[in-house]
Amino acid sequence: MWTQKWHKYYTAQVDENDCGLAALNMILKYYGSDYMLAHLRQLAKTTADGTTVLGLVKAAKHLNLNAEAVRADMDALTASQLPLPVIVHVFKKNKLPHYYVVYQVTENDLIIGDPDPTVKTTKISKSQFAKEWTQIAIIIAPTVKYKPIKESRHTLIDLVPLLIKQKRLIGLIITAAAITTLISIAGAYFFQLIIDTYLPHLMTNRLSLVAIGLIVAYAFQAIINYIQSFFTIVLGQRLMIDIVLKYVHHLFDLPMNFFTTRHVGEMTSRFSDASKIIDALGSTTLTLFLDMWILLAVGLFLAYQNINLFLCSLVVVPIYISIVWLFKKTFNRLNQDTMESNAVLNSAIIESLSGIETIKSLTGEATTKKKIDTLFSDLLHKNLAYQKADQGQQAIKAATKLILTIVILWWGTFFVMRHQLSLGQLLTYNALLAYFLTPLENIINLQPKLQAARVANNRLNEVYLVESEFSKSREITALEQLNGDIEVNHVSFNYGYCSNILEDVSLTIPHHQKITIVGMSGSGKTTLAKLLVGFFEPQEQHGEIQINHHNISDISRTILRQYINYVPQEPFIFSGSVLENLLLGSRPGVTQQMIDQACSFAEIKTDIENLPQGYHTRLSESGFNLSGGQKQRLSIARALLSPAQCFIFDESTSNLDTITEHKIVSKLLFMKDKTIIFVAHRLNIASQTDKVVVLDHGKIVEQGSHRQLLNYNGYYARLIHNQE
């Protein structure tokens, strides 16, 4: 009873690392607001590891709330020294970092909101809470500027236009179903004629004629059933295109920071979420238009047969509704729980398969299998709980249906004995009763499907709410506008609310210059390179990057990446032919001669020619049939086939032998019409470029030519000395 008072403020986490965001939204609901978790995620700068306490404080302040993280103990909580509700950081079950919202403190218990949808708003004993609490609390209260805001949420109703688009197909399905229903009613009525008319009067000719007609009708019904099933499959596929492909396309349009703050399994698990939405949309459409029609048509016929038996049959309706209501909350909780467990398992499997080489080299198979076994067992356990609830509901409905059938026959027999109903009418009524109860069951069965779809739709919308990096209108939309110097002006950058990776970096890279960025691991070299190509953006009011005096925030992301080609240390090779990999992102009109030249340039042409089918040789996923050096050379050739005028090679030759590396680097340096940026540990490359930029702890400590920096005898000179 006490928990019901607070349940209206409850918010469930969508993904495993959303617990802090859900807790924050519970506080926001208490103060009259309601935000989408995707919005709060951006404000709190949530990463794949979750949300920090600092992130929650910053997000709350951004929404005009006073927020302060404090350290407290049970005495302070019990003595009401902490204003409630309050967010607390815990180690759930003494191992999982998590957040609760404490709503109320009683003599022996606390009323908490747990973002875990399997728990929700509940009581927890003070002793158990004390074991889990890290004694960190976040006190939040509105400021004078605070105004409640309730963000609109997309619901399943928003998907109705997808169904309207398929109205012709849906109309054909409904028409086919109407025809088959009429034939079924006619078939049931035939039994009444046999018993009440043909048998008593020995009407053999009429019996044969009607029987042959019904055989033809049933054959026609089979054809119509096939057509209806085919159209239903087509409807499902068209909805799949509108929902699943739309989600895939949106994923590819999202900015890079979306992928760095989420697990792959969280994204892939939403494909199965989409199938739940499609199932619900298809079922809802057919049920509303088809089953409702059948229910009405058969119901009228049954009422015509015997109104008393029909009224008896209607008793099942409130019983079915009660069954649905009893299972509603259970299905909602179990659906959310199963989807989350599936996402966690997918992430673990994908991560393990991606790192299989490391697992095998460390003989970590047993540990990995144990981890996956645990997650798989958890998913099976939660899926079993869902299936138990579903089968329990189905069993109750089946029992109700059987009991009703017996009651109808029992009561109907009395009508026959009193000559108020013929035997044929009773048998016909009983036969048609199934056609009445089946659509009624279909309507009732919508409940778990719609609940699963609602949860799945919420999960999909959390991704759709992340803005595409291509949605913003940008001024620069032509490559020709970018031919000029690259300027980095006082740029600072960090990931989340961590300390700065780059600190007040200023750098000018003249057009067609060749430079090398060097520094120890973690100095910010790769981060700077990714900022140049627009994978991440500098913090607001913390500097800017310009190309030919155009801020890169004003440059179309497609044009920016066509102008600057970033080649990472670990290039990704896609499953497909060598040629398909080379042509990915290539400039228009690439000829075989150009491909040969690029491959010769990258010292990979001979290797390709030695493959079984040359350029048409199929490569496995991630290029497992290529060496690390071959992958790097292939990626360099691929970059040379792009329209890029500037190349960033981020340790892109680290797996090459020194002779091959020297050949390729020398050729790159000879490209007078290209800007070349090397990010390197091997300082022999730095000695060949026009300029060397030295980074240390996110700051440029030195820059100049190789000779100038050696003469300066500073940080760079020490790096050279240590490498020798």
Swiss-Prot record:
Annotated Peptidase C39 domain residues:
13-140
The entry's ATP-binding residues are G519, M520, S521, G522, S523, G524, K525, T526
Pfam families per the record? ABC_membrane (PF00664), ABC_tran (PF00005), Peptidase_C39 (PF03412)
**Among its keywords, does the record have Protease?**
yes
User: What organism is recorded for this protein?
Assistant: Pediococcus acidilactici
Described by its record, this protein's role is as follows: Involved in the export process of the bacteriocin pediocin PA-1/AcH. Is also essential for pediocin production.
Primary location recorded for the protein, binned into one broad class: membrane
| Regions that span the bilayer | 170-190, 207-227, 284-304, 307-327, 396-416, 426-446
The molecule here is called: Pediocin PA-1 transport/processing ATP-binding protein PedD
Q: Which domain of life is it from?
A: Bacteria
PROSITE patterns noted in UniProt: ABC_TM1F (PS50929), ABC_TRANSPORTER_1 (PS00211), ABC_TRANSPORTER_2 (PS50893), PEPTIDASE_C39 (PS50990)
The enzyme's E.C. designation: 3.4.22.-, 7.-.-.-
Please state every residue range assigned to the domain named ABC transmembrane type-1: 170-452
Q: Which gene encodes it?
A: pedD
What GO molecular function annotation could you give as one example from this UniProt entry?
ATP hydrolysis activity
Q: A single GO CC term, please?
A: plasma membrane
Q: Name one GO biological process term.
A: protein transport
The entry sums up its family as follows: Belongs to the ABC transporter superfamily. Pediocin PA-1 exporter (TC 3.A.1.112.2) family.
- What membrane topology does the UniProt entry give? Multi-pass membrane protein
